[in-house]
């Protein structure tokens, strides 16, 4: 789930109290006790056996894989298999992750290989958006047949931006789920490395965009691969190379989200607390498409 793969998408619900705070013996723990046991911390945090380091400021809290799984399942009511591959979570230090207005970032690792960024400056993001919108629309029939509502990709809430200096990519999408009064924000961050990509995702309602964008920009700044795993450490001809570039990375994230939402239960967005973690199998097809078909149109202004 934000995963070392095959990744799965996660849906995180905001609930006033942890679902499984009522334990087998009948004893209950308070929300404060539940959160305290998660062990949220700031400072330098190393993830996945030295793969990367997060320099977590005092304004955030990080929880590790086990605590993240507990929060996702017991606290927010996700099925147990939904947290497979989670490397941890980040949430604002000044808000309990169990509060109705809280949000969090789920972290995973996609070990598809080194992503060549040669196409970064030639991508027409307006054209790519249209392709993603068409792909999302094509899924609607399957969603309706399965008894779920439709999802429309409205547009970029923040257009994709990639830094060749830091090898970090971010973008945000505005989504319209049928029957929901507010549009949904899906904020994506990808950090490119030697053998894969760190995946950080947050989902909230569109009115939260200013807050989420400011916070995610901070997150982008304190997440980095460690020496030996960095983008610059790639050894051509020896290390695995991903079958897609930057365009496929962006399009693949939409495919993962669209494919997953076919399986969602009705009314989930009423909780306004979704976090998509990782890239699901549905993303693979989109990535393969973009590995064969590079955008030829001139780049759109960001």
Protein language model features and the residues they cover:
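Short conserved aromatic/hydrophobic patches within beta-strands of well-structured domains
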Residues: 58-64, 220-224
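Sec-dependent signal peptide recognition
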Residues: 2-9, 273-276
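Short aromatic-glycine motifs in intrinsically disordered, low-complexity regions
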Residues: 42-55, 207-218
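C-terminal single-pass membrane-anchor helix
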Residues: 242-299
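Bacterial N-terminal signal peptides
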Residues: 7-18
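Extracytoplasmic/lumenal ectodomains and periplasmic regions of secretory and membrane proteins
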Residues: 176-242
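Conserved polar/disulfide-associated segments of primarily extracytoplasmic proteins
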Residues: 23-53, 65-185, 228, 245-251, ...
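Active-site-proximal beta-strand/loop segments in catalytic clefts of secreted hydrolases
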Residues: 57, 110, 174, 201-204
